[in-house]
Amino acid sequence: MQLTKVPFGQLNGEQVDLFTLSNDNNVTIKITNYGAIITSIETPDKKGVCENIVCGFNKFEDYISNQYLGSYPYFGSIIGRFGNRIAKGKFTLEGKEYTLAVNNGANALHGGLVGFDKKLWNAEEIKADDKIGIKLSYTSPDMEEGYPGTLNVSCTYTLNNQNELVIDYEATTDQTTILNLTNHTYFNLTAGKGNIMNHELELTAEALTEAEDMIPTGKIISVEGTAFDFRTKKKLGRDIAGLEYGYDNNYVLGNNEGRLVYAGTLSEATTGRSVEVYTTQPGMQLYTGYWNPELTIDGEKKFGSYSGVALETQHYPDSVNHSNFPSPILKPGEKYQEKTIYKF
């Protein structure tokens, strides 16, 4: 196994680095400390051909270009402080109301205007006999983006020879706050040769959070007999025609005790590639990327609608405003700990 670091660019006068993790099975993962972004995951297909199976860029400049930020899909980034939506950008903690920037219609999305996805994280390399990785750390000051408490947060990416990318999140706070971290990687197992409609997905989830205008109503509803039922493996495109904007739904994993559970598998028959998902999180957002922009990169048009599918393990959207949902509240003296594994 091998771990390397090279300069990737400059942000406000500070160097941005790119780390490459390679195992002994030709799985290679590239991560930058800007936004803790996974820029590339190369895996072999059934013929042994290694290609990048996620949406991302080879150059740092493309991550900060006006073209990309103008229709921003959060490729590969860590989302925080609060992944997904908070209704009207408002929540109450210990009797005090907090107001966040509204950046998605009438709601707050993915941590605000400058979330963790746009921060420069500190990086520490990890080299062990059975894994390699990087630990990325960031201190979010009190009231950054409207969230209370100074938050010390870390995201550790490790790769092993079982072809597992393990993401470990940890955080502590000095005031009661809310936290919901996720990774926003989009997978395309054809390496971008086609869209994701013929990818097959199996999910264990028996229910999802009902939503109106992307905000949970508070009800948990069964997937039985609906287009949202993936308990038996099926193609993403099979039932998508009846969904105006494709899939963008929070699945209930029935995992409120923080155990590591199997959530599902994404696979693609022509390449033989697959991604298994395991997590301690109670939910997972399935997002098929309807709003992904078509971008011109090095003179070539890339991405666009349905160019990748995100499997975002998370706490439920707007969970701070629903007492019947698993709580995203973190108090002083407590440690936030979550784990997600993508196995290739």
Annotate each predicted stretch with a short phrase.
Residues 1-344:
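An exposed, glycine/acidic-rich loop-and-rim segment of catalytic or binding clefts
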